[in-house]
């Protein structure tokens, strides 16, 4: 992938950009095999990759510069700003949005937040695009509600320029820290969730719910999990750390009992909406802590699917799964190091199958799907 920002030394986020994709995949596979070297693996499936540019469905832009000439991008470690509107990881559809947002910031008088001076209002702009219909969600992260009335007043102009903006919100993040969002979300549109569709499964994206940033690879990840589950004798499963329900909604069949658990209520609202659309009545989604939910249950399903954050599932949940011993565990991980650590804590299980998904090209990161079977 050619990147003028990288070539000019202005951005180093894609540290592996000079390596061809096959070399990147080989290095990631070697890393994964090294992390799992202590465990016998029955089957290594071929790694899955997607487009090498224009694949991201989300932009997280730090807003800097002045209200008349805002910059959208990032801050270097020394505090100097860098405009990343031309980043080749973004699809071509993002460029007109960035182009319209810059004059809009001036029109609405949204002074960019200055980290050094602790002054200004507009901290971040977060943009997400649906692959199914091209609809977009735009979030303005502000320090306070001071400029909210001005923003509302100026908004019709932006909506006229960009009719693809289906969901627009303001998030209030008052803390002087590098935190992307606060707890308060104010909707400026009637529509509150962005419609998405992977493999004919309806999914919904809300402002504060996690959603994969590489749709081409994520849809293959979900489809693979579905294929693996269909090969297993499973009538009852748990989907822990379920997010908006991507895995559970793909894996569930009309006669299967499934419980999806996620701590974020926004994500659970999305999952419930999808389940209702699919007419799946035996699916339950609850906003709870996954570990607390699991360890409080007496009955054990045949399959537990886990998709934890980078820290992994942790020892308490590993201990519980070891004791209760479901027949199968499917572990989806964005951090193979913590996954390997967790598998060490599950001595009663063997690794049946492993597959790497190149969710983050040009970096050392990847997603991995692992099927564990009770010994």
Curated annotation (Swiss-Prot):
- Give the matching PANTHER family: RNA M5U METHYLTRANSFERASE, TRNA (URACIL(54)-C(5))-METHYLTRANSFERASE
- The UniProt annotation places S-adenosyl-L-methionine binding at 212, 241, 262, 307
Q: Which family does it belong to?
A: Belongs to the class I-like SAM-binding methyltransferase superfamily. RNA M5U methyltransferase family. RlmC subfamily.
Q: Which UniProt keywords apply?
A: 4Fe-4S, Iron, Iron-sulfur, Metal-binding, Methyltransferase, rRNA processing, S-adenosyl-L-methionine, Transferase
Q: What is its EC number?
A: 2.1.1.189
Q: Which residues bind [4Fe-4S] cluster?
A: 3, 11, 14, 87
According to its UniProt record, what is one Pfam family this protein matches?
Answer: tRNA_U5-meth_tr
Reactions catalysed, semicolon-separated, are: uridine(747) in 23S rRNA + S-adenosyl-L-methionine = 5-methyluridine(747) in 23S rRNA + S-adenosyl-L-homocysteine + H(+)
Fetch the Gene3D superfamilies from UniProt: 2.40.50.1070, Vaccinia Virus protein VP39
Q: What is this protein called?
A: 23S rRNA (uracil(747)-C(5))-methyltransferase RlmC
Report the InterPro entries cross-referenced here.
Answer: 23SrRNA_MeTrfase_RlmC, MeTrfase_TrmA_AS, MeTrfase_TrmA_CS, SAM-dependent_MTases_sf, U5_MeTrfase_fam
One of the GO BP terms on file: rRNA base methylation
GO MF terms listed in the record are: 4 iron, 4 sulfur cluster binding; iron ion binding; rRNA (uridine-C5-)-methyltransferase activity
Q: Which CDD domains does the record cross-reference, listed alphabetically?
A: AdoMet_MTases
Catalytic residues (UniProt): 334
What does the record give as the function of this protein? Catalyzes the formation of 5-methyl-uridine at position 747 (m5U747) in 23S rRNA.
